[in-house]
Design a protein with these regions (language model features):
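Extended catalytic/binding region for NAD+/ADP-ribose chemistry, centered on the ART fold
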Residues: 33-57
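N-proximal short alpha-helices
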Residues: 24, 45, 102-106
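Conserved NAD+-utilizing ADP-ribose enzyme module
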Residues: 2-14, 36-37, 57-173
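Short, conserved beta-strand segments within well-ordered enzyme catalytic domains
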Residues: 18, 43-45, 71-73
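Short, flexible loop/turn elements at secondary-structure junctions
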Residues: 21, 48, 76-78
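Short aromatic-glycine-(Arg/Gly/Cys) micro-motifs in beta-strand/loop hairpins
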Residues: 12-35
C-alpha cells in the first residue's frame, strides 16, 4: 500500500518534466547513467523551472544541442491505488532509509539495479545534499548526522521511472 503526501498529489493527471539537450520522442532506458540517486532510469521533475536548469546543465555537459524541457502526463492515481500494476516507493522527506537507498544506488556501477521498484519518488540529492553525501562517504560524518543536517533543507522532488512497464504509463505532450 502506498501513501502519497497531499502536497504532491493532484487529481487526475500529473504533469512531469525532463530536462535534456534533445527532444525525446521515445524514452530509452539503455541511455540511463549508472550511479544515480535511484538507479538507472528516466528522471522527471514536477517543477518545470528545475527541469530547465537540468536541461541547461545537460547541454553544457554534452557540449551539444540546446536546453529542452520534455513534458509528460502521468495518471497519479497509479501511485496510491491498492490494485496498481506498478511497484512504487515514495520517500516523503529526507530520512535514514532515503539516505541508505541513495548510497546503495550511487555506489552501484553495474547494469543490475539494487531495487525492484518501477517508480521511486523522493528528494533529489542536489548540490547541498551531494556535499553531505561526499562528507559521509569520506567518513567525516555518519549517516544519522547527515540526515539531521538535511532536515532544514527543503527538498526538491524527483520521479524515477526505472522499468519499461513504468515508462509505458508516461504520455508525452
Amino acid at each position: 500500500h502506498v501513501v502519497v503526501s497531499k502536497e504532491w498529489r493532484t487529481i487526475g493527471m500529473l504533469k512531469l518534466y525532463h530536462g535534456s539537450n534533445v527532444v525525446i520522442d521515445k524514452i530509452d532506458l539503455c541511455r540511463s547513467r549508472k550511479g544515480k540517486d535511484f538507479g538507472c532510469g528516466f528522471y522527471l521533475n514536477p517543477n518545470k523551472d528545475q527541469a530547465m536548469e537540468m536541461a541547461v546543465r545537460t547541454s553544457k555537459r554534452m557540449q551539444e544541442g540546446e536546453p529542452i524541457v520534455n513534458a509528460y502526463l502521468f495518471d497519479d492515481s497509479l501511485l496510491s491505488s491498492e490494485c496498481t500494476p506498478l511497484s512504487v516507493k515514495i520517500f516523503e522527506d529526507y530520512s535514514l532509509e532515503w539516505a541508505e537507498f541513495i548510497l546503495k544506488n550511487r555506489k552501484n556501477m553495474t547494469s543490475h539495479p539494487v531495487h525492484s521498484y518501477d517508480i521511486v519518488i523522493g528528494p533529489i540529492a542536489d548540490d547541498t545534499v551531494g556535499l553531505q553525501m561526499r562528507r559521509l562517504m569520506q567518513g567525516y560524518i555518519d549517516i544519522e548526522r547527515m540526515v539531521e543536517e538535511l532536515r532544514f533543507h527543503k527538498p526538491a522532488i524527483q520521479y524515477f521511472f526505472g522499468t519499461e512497464k513504468a515508462i509505458s504509463y508516461l504520455k508525452r505532450i
